[in-house]
Design a protein with these regions (language model features):
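Bacterial Sec-dependent N-terminal signal peptides
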Residues: 1-20
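Solvent-exposed N-terminal domain segments of exported/luminal and surface proteins
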Residues: 19-135, 142
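C-terminal tail/sorting-segment detector
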Residues: 388, 392, 396-418
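Extracellular-facing segments of soluble proteins and assemblies that are Gly/Ser/Thr-biased and enriched
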Residues: 99-183, 188-191
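Extended, compositionally biased non-globular segments
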Residues: 182, 196-301
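Glycine-centered coil/turn sites that cap beta-strands in beta-rich domains
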Residues: 324-340, 344-364, 386-389
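A glycine-anchored, Pro-Gly-centered beta-turn/N-cap motif
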Residues: 152, 270, 383, 395-398
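A recurrent domain-boundary module in secreted/ectodomain proteins
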Residues: 111, 278-326
Length: 418
């Protein structure tokens, strides 16, 4: 029977029985080790809770990487005790789109809020010619392109330099989620929206206007003299104000919201997604992350202090855990370790180690070869991992754990006794 099972497993595919943690749950950097960030504040995501319709992100707003100092900025990062709500089935907003207002409009996967490009200041306070925060506030950014607002609200307006490593050879990963539920990716994606054509840098469709003065808006609107912007100069160079830019259809790869619908590794059937935009040299390019409006229907209870009240039954998400080895210890072999406890009821820990970076597939099958659940299906760095398998919805019996990485397969039996 075992020989027959081993022969059948590579060819078995029963999608209706397969389950995997969706990216809106698995993408978050959950703090499972007590790591702290600035001033000893607990870093990254504290807890992820979810219902059928929403994911709730509990976070401090402080990352685990080093932040600060902030020149010419009297504020310091503080624990914000955020609870953000991310819709799990995002919907396109029909009619008038919702503006990306001042303050947090989205959240990175480590719990740091995302702000739009707009500075709070406009020329002569007339609500036209708004300063571009990336230029106007640049002196106060730390080495990770972030800074704290009044009240200690640390945030970024642009490419989160310290959150990920740029790699132009592969599709960027999910870096965060917008409050309309659509994911935010790094700057690299498939050349074609159907997933073909190789990898390319996603180019913004915004460009600097060809103007010699600031008397009109993009689209041709003529302003009253009292609404004119300052003369273009070294003090106020072209690009210092948001109105210095215009959207040009098909100028780049992305739409007016700075996103597109396309297949991605996490969403193989396609998803609308925003993209971080940078130049060929890595410099942030307008509108940087998201533009003036959201694409989808927004969970507006995220606005204000950012402490959403949960009014529905929720479960707490248990993530796949990277196991920190002892000092000097490195994974030298590919190995699937025996689960613990075994037998188990209802859950057990499955651990494994990777000697090299690999695409990992970790699945559970019943003894007939039917796929029951997908626990892991993504690229992982070399190291030690453990994942919790919950068999609450399964009958007592023997199940097969199968892991495949770097063209190598290992299997083991586990026993559920209720």
């Amino acid at each position: 029977m075992k020989l027959l099972l081993l022969l059948l497993l590579p060819f078995i595919c029963v999608p209706s029985f397969a389950q995997t943690d969706p990216p809106e749950l698995s993408s978050w950097m959950i703090n499972t080790t007590g790591v702290t960030g600035y001033n000893g504040i607990s870093a990254n995501i504290q807890k992820v809770q979810y219902s059928t319709g929403n994911v709730y992100i509990n976070c401090t707003g402080v990352p685990s990487f080093t932040i600060g100092p902030w020149q010419a900025n009297p504020n310091t990062a503080q624990d914000q005790k955020y609870v953000f709500r991310i819709p799990r089935s995002p919907k396109i907003k029909t009619g008038t789109k919702t503006a990306t207002r001042l303050g947090h409009i989205a959240v990175w996967k480590n719990g740091v809020p995302i702000y739009n490009p707009k500075d709070a200041f406009s020329y002569n306070s007339l609500n036209v010619w708004f300063q571009d925060a990336v230029l106007a506030e640049a002196i106060s950014f730390d080495g990770c392109y972030g800074h704290p607002a009044p009240g200690g609200r640390y945030h970024t307006h642009q490419n989160p330099k310290c959150l990920y490593t740029l790699d132009s050879s592969k599709h960027s990963g999910v870096l965060g989620y917008s409050f309309d539920g659509f994911p935010i990716y790094g700057p690299f994606g498939y050349k074609n929206s159907d997933g073909t054509g190789g990898i390319t840098r996603m180019k913004t469709s915004y460009k600097l206007r060809v103007i010699s003065d600031r008397t009109t808006l993009a689209g041709g609107t003529t302003l009253q003299p009292n609404q004119y912007g300052p003369t273009i100069s070294t003090t106020y160079p072209l690009g210092f104000y948001l109105e210095d830019y215009e959207f040009a259809q098909s100028y780049g790869d992305l739409d007016v919201y700075n996103g597109r619908f396309a297949k991605t590794p996490e969403y193989p059937n396609g998803i609308y997604a925003y993209h971080v935009t940078i130049s060929s040299t890595g410099k942030s390019e307008f509108p940087y992350i998201m533009a003036a409006n959201y694409y989808g229907e927004v969970a507006e209870d995220n606005f204000g202090p950012g402490r959403v009240t949960i009014t529905e039954p929720v479960s707490t998400y248990t993530p796949l855990t990277f196991v920190t080895p002892s000092i000097g210890e490195v994974a030298t072999i590919f190995e699937l370790n025996q689960n613990y406890p075994n037998p188990f009821n209802p859950s057990t820990i499955i651990s494994y180690q990777l000697p090299i970076n690999s695409f990992v597939s970790l699945k559970i099958y019943d003894v007939l070869g039917k796929e029951i659940k997908t626990l892991v299906n993504k690229n992982q760095d070399a190291g030690y991992y453990k994942v919790d398998f919950d068999g609450s919805n399964l009958q007592s019996g023997v199940y097969i754990v199968r892991i495949e990485a770097d063209k190598t397969v290992q299997e083991m039996k586990i026993t559920l006794i209720k």
